[in-house]
Amino acid sequence: MSNQEFAQRWQGVMIDSYGTPGLSFVRGEGSTLWDADGTAYTDFVSGLAVNALGHAHPAVVGAVSRQIASLGHISNFYSAEPTITLAERLIELFGRPGRVFFCNSGAEANETAFKIGRLTGRSRIVAAQSGFHGRTMGSLALTGQPAKREPFLPLPGDVTHVPYGDAEALRAAVTEDTAMVILEPIQGESGVVVPPKGYLRAAREITEATGTLLVLDEVQTGIGRTGHWFAAQAEGVEADVVTLAKGLGGGLPLGAAVAFGRAAELMTPGHHASTFGGNPVSCARTRVLDTIAADGLLDRVKQLGSAPDEWSVRDAAAIRWSPMSGAGLMLGIVLNEPLAPQVQLAAQKAGFLVNVPAPDVVRLIPPLVIEETEVDAFLQALPGLLDAVHERDREGQTGE
C-alpha cells in the first residue's frame, strides 16, 4: 500500500485536526524511517522529541517485550515493580527527595501541576507569553499562544502571561497571592527560544520570596535532550514541580509530574488520578534512562549539539540564516525570511525529516543516538536546500 492510498484511508475515517499526512511510515531503525513507498529518511523529528533512543532500539524492544509478556495493565489500585523502579530512578536523577505522579502525556503532567498549584490555597498563576504546555483545557489555559487558546475560550481562569525571558516583568506579576509560576527552560513550540542566562535563577528567587511554587515544564527539554538530564540543571535551578513526558517514555505514552518539598505533600487520595498512569509496560522504559547513562549519551548530545552551532556561525552570511538557537539536540535554524515550511518540504524531498514550529524556524530534535555522519550529511545538504528555496521564492515574487 502506498503513501497515497494511506492518505485516502486517513481522510475517510480520521477527524481533521492534523491535516492529511503526506507520508505513512512502515518501519524504523535507529535514526532512519521508511515510508510506504519504500523511501528512507533521516529522522530529525523523532516523534516530536519522543524517541530518545531512536526507532526499534534493542534494549527498549527487549524490556517492553518482556514486560508485556508478564504483566500489562493493572490500574493504580495496585502497584507493580516497573512503576516503582522508574519513580525511584527519576528521584535519583534529581538528587533530592521527591514524589512522582505518572500519567500519559505532557499535557496531563501539566494538568497535574495546575492542580498542585491550586492546592496551595492560592488561585493566581503566572505563565509565559508564547509558552506551550498542552492542548487540554487546563494546560491550554497555561499556554501563552492566543491562536491556540481563542477557539476554546473561556478557559480556566486567573492565569497571567508575561514576556518570556523578562525577569522584571515576572517579578512585577508574582505576588503573595500567586499559587505557581510555570515556565519552559527553553520554549520549543514557539521556535526554540532560549531565555537570557540567569532567567531561571531569577524565577527561582522571585518565587521563593513570595512563597510561590516554581513549576518547570521539561516535557521537551528533559531526559537528556539538552545534554543534561533536565535542562534546568545547567543553571543549578531546583523547581518545586517538574513535568516530564516525550523522551521519558521513549516511544510509549508516559508523562510524569515530579514534586519536591511541600509540593510533594499537597495531593492526597481522591485529588487526582490517571487510569493508565504508571502502566507497567510504559514504565519498563526505565531502560531508556539506563541506556542514556551507560552509553554516555549526555556528553555525546553536548558534543553533537555544538558542531552545527559552530558551522552556522561560520557560514551564516552565505546562506542567509542566523546562528542556531537551542541546546544539545534541541536546535532551531532561525531563518531571515519566513520560508521554514518550504525548507521542510525541500528537506523531505532530499531525505531528511525536520519540523517547523514557526514560519521562520526549522527545528531539529533528532534521536539522541543519531550518528555524527547523519548530522554531517544534513548540514552539508542544508545550504543547497536553503539556496533552492530562496531562489524559488524570489522567482515567485518577480514572476520570472
Curated annotation (Swiss-Prot):
It holds the Pfam family Aminotran_3. Pathway: Amino-acid biosynthesis; L-arginine biosynthesis; N(2)-acetyl-L-ornithine from L-glutamate: step 4/4. Its EC number is 2.6.1.11. N(2)-acetyl-L-ornithine binds at R135, S274. Coiled coil: none annotated. It is found in: Cytoplasm. One of its GO terms (cellular component) is cytoplasm. It comes from the Bacteria. Binds 1 pyridoxal phosphate per subunit. Pyridoxal 5'-phosphate binds at G106, A107, F132, D217, E218, V219, Q220, T275. It catalyses: N(2)-acetyl-L-ornithine + 2-oxoglutarate = N-acetyl-L-glutamate 5-semialdehyde + L-glutamate. GO terms for molecular function: identical protein binding; N2-acetyl-L-ornithine:2-oxoglutarate 5-aminotransferase activity; pyridoxal phosphate binding. The modification N6-(pyridoxal phosphate)lysine is found at K246. InterPro entries: AcOrn/SuccOrn_fam, Aminotrans_3, Aminotrans_3_PPA_site, Class-III_PLP-dep_AT, PyrdxlP-dep_Trfase, PyrdxlP-dep_Trfase_major, PyrdxlP-dep_Trfase_small. Its cofactor is pyridoxal 5'-phosphate. GO terms for biological process: L-arginine biosynthetic process. Keywords: Amino-acid biosynthesis, Aminotransferase, Arginine biosynthesis, Cytoplasm, Pyridoxal phosphate, Transferase. Belongs to the class-III pyridoxal-phosphate-dependent aminotransferase family. ArgD subfamily. PANTHER family: ACETYLORNITHINE AMINOTRANSFERASE, MITOCHONDRIAL, AMINOTRANSFERASE CLASS III. Homodimer. NCBIfam families: argD (TIGR00707), PRK03244.1 (NF002874). May also have succinyldiaminopimelate aminotransferase activity, thus carrying out the corresponding step in lysine biosynthesis. This is Acetylornithine aminotransferase. It comes from Streptomyces clavuligerus.
